[in-house]
Amino acid sequence: MKTAITIAGTDSSGGAGIQADIKTMITNGVYAMSAITALTAQNTTGVTSILNATPEFLGQELDSIFTDIYLDCLLYT
């Protein structure tokens, strides 16, 4: 099975961001992983709030994946 990681923010409504990327990957038979750059409070009408991940935390997320799992694809949005 092919593997991929999405590096993006969340979308609490599920229509974009990591949630949408993971749905797309799974639909296409890809093992999906993620590194979260920001948490958002949003719905279909707009974004209420954004909490950005620190560069250090993002680095820890990526190190955790890269030291354990071979990646076939990286999606950065």
Identify the residue ranges that each predicted region occupies.
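Small-residue (G/A/S/T)-rich helix-start motifs and N-terminal tracts that mark the onset
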Residues: 1-72
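Conserved small/polar residues in nucleotide/adenosyl-binding loops
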Residues: 76-77
